[in-house]
Design a protein with these regions (language model features):
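Start-of-helix register in tetratricopeptide repeats
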Residues: 22, 56-59, 93
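Register position in tetratricopeptide repeats
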Residues: 33-34, 67-70, 104-105
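Short coil turns that delineate tetratricopeptide repeat
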Residues: 52-55, 89
């Protein structure tokens, strides 16, 4: 009986702390709203690793680009926006955000 309880104690934290793609995405949005940008970036990356082929990744990559842009990581932000465009090539807001970064960096396409 003691062995079963000990086994459950070791397994329970893993289940409690495992988060779904949706939960990570929602927590990332909360962090963005609270201006906890490094934490938001980490949560978005975790969600993307969980489901790399999810169709909603265009939004996650776009949000990641926003976070990285606000952190001043322009090269990373460009890469994130480009990945977002792989999922949604005609998304005008993403195209505009990527163009704005090019302008901020003084680059032309």
């Amino acid at each position: 009986m003691v062995r079963i309880i000990i086994a459950l104690l070791f397994c329970f934290p893993a289940v409690t702390f495992a988060q779904t793609y949706q939960q990570l995405s929602e927590r990332a949005i909360e962090c963005i709203e609270k201006d906890s940008l490094p934490q938001a970036e980490e949560l978005l990356l975790q969600a993307l690793k969980l489901e790399p082929k999810n169709a909603k990744n265009a939004l996650l990559f776009s949000n990641l680009g926003l976070v990285q842009r606000r952190l001043g990581e322009f090269d990373k932000a460009l890469e994130s926006y480009s990945f977002a465009l792989n999922f949604a090539p005609l998304a005008v807001p993403i195209l505009l955000d990527r163009a704005a970064i090019y302008m901020e960096m003084g680059k032309t396409v």
